[in-house]
């Protein structure tokens, strides 16, 4: 099921507000996930996971690019994210629970940076968006 028009507009407005800093916020969410949920680091043993590491920043930018792609294709997330889903589920064998944990951290980050804008409506729309993204990524796990 696709997001409602109001939710799509709300998510797109947040993305516009984040502007060129989406990578910075995605990196912060990754760092938060690694600190708060250490089990997620098992997929990244080959990276320097210290705060501010260039490798984490590079992966944060990949997350940001994937989420931006999702925002640009809100009407058909499964198709837009199919290559990413295949890589993470089939090749990397990422536990679907890790998507949930990152989703939580991605929700916290804009709330921290935009507290005045983080209304119940924005919160609900972002939860729905992230749930759709997570569902699209984890759909091959079923």
From Swiss-Prot:
Q: What keywords would UniProt list here? A: Heme, Iron, Metal-binding, Oxygen transport, Transport
Question: Which Pfam families does the entry mention?
Answer: Globin
Heme among keywords:
yes
Q: What GO CC terms are in its UniProt record?
A: haptoglobin-hemoglobin complex; hemoglobin complex
Biological process annotations from GO: cellular oxidant detoxification; hydrogen peroxide catabolic process
Binding positions (heme b): 59, 88
Provide the family line: Belongs to the globin family.
Globin domain boundaries: 2-142
Q: What is the name of this protein?
A: Hemoglobin subunit theta-1
Q: Which GO terms describe its molecular function?
A: heme binding; iron ion binding; oxygen binding; oxygen carrier activity
Point out the coiled-coil segments of this chain: none
* Originating organism: Equus caballus
